[in-house]
A protein has these predicted regions:
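C-terminal scaffold of the Radical SAM
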Residues: 1-238
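Short amphipathic alpha-helical interaction segments
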Residues: 237-253
Length: 256
């Protein structure tokens, strides 16, 4: 707070085993206002598919009751074998009924360097399931605030992707500045070494041209499902139509 203006709070990503009353108190006392918990699923069969150990969720719920934050988001994965809307509804309601006021539901992403011992859901089924999730959340009155995220009451958000600028701390964290994008090292020991030597843990820095910064802005603004021409002009000092008139025309012709 001595060096930067914090406009949208301080968020921390947590593993379920880290959600204890003691640790939450430490985070809150340090100024953290938002937390995101990587639940993935409350159901043991899907945790096994993901190689995750079973967690005592009641301990998590109890800790969240005792130590409250402005935003408590829980992350889930959909499009796993055998998953249906009914199984996902169970996860969604359990989250919102036990301390979460925001959820993120991401499709399973198969990274090439990870082991997977099950068959992926087809893109057609995945898309159908996403539409079912969106319809269900709309009927329940939950507010969709980005492609994969929903707020219980519409006033809680947790995402760096939809912020114009942000600072990231920790392994693999990213930082977005006015014309730079920085990625921290993924290696824990290298991260610790750099910090102990009073060096930045950055492993990659991208210097944006003005055009690249605009593209980045538009890509992640679209992620929030709404591109506002007034916001674009306020941020860049130029109109969206002037900078991307041709692209917008093509998009309209394609019905986008």
């Amino acid at each position: 707070k001595r060096h930067v203006v914090i406009a949208e709070g301080v968020g921390v990503e947590l593993h379920p085993t880290d959600v204890t009353e003691e640790k939450l108190i430490i985070l809150k006392d340090a100024g953290v206002t938002k937390i995101s918990i990587g639940i993935q699923s409350f159901q043991e069969e899907y945790l096994k598919l993901l190689g995750r150990e079973k967690t005592d969720h009641n301990k998590i719920f109890d800790a969240l009751k005792k130590v409250q934050f402005e935003t408590v988001s829980m992350d889930f994965i959909f499009a796993l074998p055998g998953q249906t809307l009914e199984t996902l509804k169970t996860d969604i309601e359990m989250a919102f009924n036990n301390g979460a006021n925001h959820i993120a539901i991401y499709p399973f992403i198969d990274f090439t360097f990870t082991d997977r011992n099950f068959i992926k859901m087809t893109n057609r089924k995945k898309k159908k399931l996403l539409y079912e999730i969106v319809d269900y959340c709309n009927k329940k009155g939950y507010v969709r605030d980005s492609l994969w995220t929903f707020s219980k009451h519409g006033n809680s958000r947790y995402s760096s992707m939809t912020r114009e600028n942000f600072l990231g701390f920790g392994c693999s964290a990213t930082t977005l500045l006015e014309n730079k994008f920085k990625i921290n090292t993924f290696d824990i020991y290298e991260y610790q070494k750099r910090i102990n030597e009073n060096e930045l843990p950055t492993s990659l820095t991208l210097n944006f041209s003005r055009r690249q910064r605009m593209v980045y802005y538009l890509f992640w603004t679209a992620y929030s499902l709404r591109v506002d021409s007034k916001d674009f002009k306020e941020f860049f000092g130029e109109s969206l139509e002037r900078c991307y008139g041709f692209e917008l025309l093509v998009a309209r012709l394609l019905g986008l």
